[in-house]
């Protein structure tokens, strides 16, 4: 663990009561939230330079030194490219794991359509981000404890990531007027990207980010912190080679507290790996019911959003149904004395709640 981000929710006011003398003896705790962050980038860029071999290919020391400088610069170029990829991957990761709010625009649409839709909705979000709201951070979305947090963003801290094929159809002049912000300031807060795909070190695509075409966020959503960066080198006299090692150690995380909305043509589907059942906030593996009872179904991860199928092993004893269409709240209704197992299933993952009916 590298550190933590601490957020203190705004205090809630109360109506003044001149007769409340006992209130001075109560404890009023601040609503403090904590997100733990880790160092997750530790990359080394190696390079071997054998000067005697290089000298054979050059007619002057000046050309040789210039070439060696180009070789060492390649280490930094590789590092900067990786940092660009890691930054884009933050957006892809948050979207893929359903840990960020998503604004969907129905497809199929052309880049022109996406640009128009983005401009209109981004204008609305640009204004809403500046108001105290619980709607655009991901704290509750990922199962953060306590009440939802209230956040807001200064207009100069709102940044936009946009895919190049969509950005090409966006008129920055119109956008600046719509946002009521200086064009130069807006341009400084727009970051065009080629795509939100994620690739392995071998160049294999490991995440298809074609559904994502943009993002509007508080710049503090990006938790990118340098830990250490240094160059080391050593000379190997045995083969007259100089070894260079550029080390880059950083933290690449995203904040659950900051406002952020991803624009995509569809939401990502996250499957659960486990279920648990809560009745009045307490985890249960078995319950006894005498009347219709609501049960909260909590998934691992909490942000899993795949549609859950519920079933009763004995509908003559108890039935189960999603409450008001909610995916993770069910109502178990008694039918006759006896027992039944209520199951929650997604794919091959199943959770079971044993129910005893006593009517």
Language-model features: where?
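Surface-exposed assembly/interface segments
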Residues: 1, 64-65, 359
């Amino acid at each position: 663990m590298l550190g933590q981000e601490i957020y203190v929710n705004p205090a809630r006011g109360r109506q003044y009561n001149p007769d409340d003398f006992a209130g001075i003896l109560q404890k009023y705790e601040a609503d403090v939230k904590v997100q733990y962050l880790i160092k997750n980038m530790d990359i080394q860029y190696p390079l071997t330079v054998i000067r005697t071999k290089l000298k054979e290919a050059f007619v002057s020391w000046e050309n040789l030194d210039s070439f060696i400088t180009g070789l060492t610069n390649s280490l930094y170029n590789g590092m900067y490219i990786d940092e660009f990829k890691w930054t884009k991957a933050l957006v892809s990761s948050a979207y893929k794991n359903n840990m960020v709010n998503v604004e969907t625009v129905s497809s199929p649409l052309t880049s022109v359509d996406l640009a128009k839709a983005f401009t209109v909705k981004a204008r609305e979000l640009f204004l809403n981000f500046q108001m105290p709201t619980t709607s655009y951070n991901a704290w509750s979305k990922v199962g953060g404890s306590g009440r939802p947090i209230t956040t807001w963003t200064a207009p100069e801290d709102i940044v936009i990531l946009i895919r190049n094929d969509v950005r090409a159809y966006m008129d920055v002049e119109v956008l600046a007027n719509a946002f009521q912000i200086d064009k130069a300031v807006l341009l400084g807060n727009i970051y065009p990207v080629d795509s939100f795909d994620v690739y392995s070190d071998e160049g294999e695509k490991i995440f298809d980010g074609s559904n994502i075409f943009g993002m509007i966020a508080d710049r503090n959503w990006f938790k990118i912190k340098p830990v250490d960066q240094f160059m080391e080198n050593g000379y190997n006299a045995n083969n007259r080679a100089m070894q260079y090692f550029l080390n880059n150690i950083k933290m690449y995380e995203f904040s659950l507290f900051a406002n952020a909305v991803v624009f995509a043509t569809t939401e990502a589907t996250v499957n659960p790996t486990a279920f648990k059942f809560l009745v009045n906030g307490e985890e249960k593996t078995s319950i006894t019911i005498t009347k219709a009872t609501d049960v909260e179904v909590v998934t691992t991860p909490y942000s899993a959003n795949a549609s859950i199928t519920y079933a009763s092993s004995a509908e003559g004893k108890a039935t189960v149904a999603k409450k008001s269409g909610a995916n993770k709240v069910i109502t178990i209704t008694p039918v006759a004395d006896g027992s039944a197992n209520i199951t929650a299933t997604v794919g091959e993952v199943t959770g079971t709640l044993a129910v005893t009916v006593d009517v």
